Swiss-Prot record:
Protein name: Sec-independent protein translocase protein TatB
Membrane topology: Single-pass membrane protein
Native source species: Frankia casuarinae (strain DSM 45818 / CECT 9043 / HFP020203 / CcI3)
InterPro entries recorded: TatA/B/E, TatB
One matching Pfam family: TatA_B_E
Function field: Part of the twin-arginine translocation (Tat) system that transports large folded proteins containing a characteristic twin-arginine motif in their signal peptide across membranes. Together with TatC, TatB is part of a receptor directly interacting with Tat signal peptides. TatB may form an oligomeric binding site that transiently accommodates folded Tat precursor proteins before their translocation.
């Protein structure tokens, strides 16, 4: 009867009623309050029955509490009660890719999975051969042949500069309509 009202609150309300109405008028006020509540319930039940009879038999199982926006959304999001027609709820392979039903496992980035030599990352990648020259052009001086391995690997990791041509530079034309 008292949804959300505990016994402590009921006792406080009775004490307030006792002080406001006094011990002589409190029983009559309680009877009047009970009568008003009973009439309100009958009025609400009558309106609910009239609504169900007006809507017809297809809405006989309609629950008025389901019409509250929060319960409506909660019911249709968390239960398998479709609001949309079945052809609109059918999932396609594109939906499964976008929503990620079976997401691919992300590669783990640990020290053991990373390549040790930064120059030898991916030989299939275009331009990987140009990053590490096989042999320096021209004659090799005896001083360079005895370079320490750490300096040699540092020299190998420096990418080769692209050759510059002295010809006229071709600029990309600017199209003001395209932007």
């Amino acid at each position: 009867m008292f949804n959300g009202v505990g016994w402590g609150e009921v006792v406080v309300l009775l004490l307030i009623g006792l002080f406001v109405f006094g011990p002589d008028r409190l029983p009559k006020a309680a009877r009047d309050a009970g009568r008003v509540l009973r009439q309100l319930r009958q009025l609400a039940n009558g309106m609910r029955n009239d609504l169900r009879s007006e809507l017809g038999p297809e809405f006989a199982d309609l629950d008025i509490r389901d019409l509250h926006p929060k319960t409506f959304v909660r019911k249709h999001l968390f239960e398998d009660d479709p609001v949309l027609p079945p052809y609109l709820t059918k999932r396609t392979s594109l939906d499964s890719l976008l929503l990620g039903d079976d997401p691919p496992a992300a590669p783990s980035l640990t020290k053991s999975s990373l390549p040790r030599d930064p120059a030898a990352k991916d030989p299939a990648r275009p331009g990987a051969e140009a990053a590490v020259p096989a042999a320096p052009p021209g004659p090799v001086s005896p001083m360079l042949s005895k370079v320490s391995p750490s300096k040699a690997s540092a020299a190998r990791s420096v990418p080769a500069q692209p050759a510059r041509s002295d010809g006229p530079a071709t600029e990309v034309p600017f199209d003001s309509d395209a932007t």
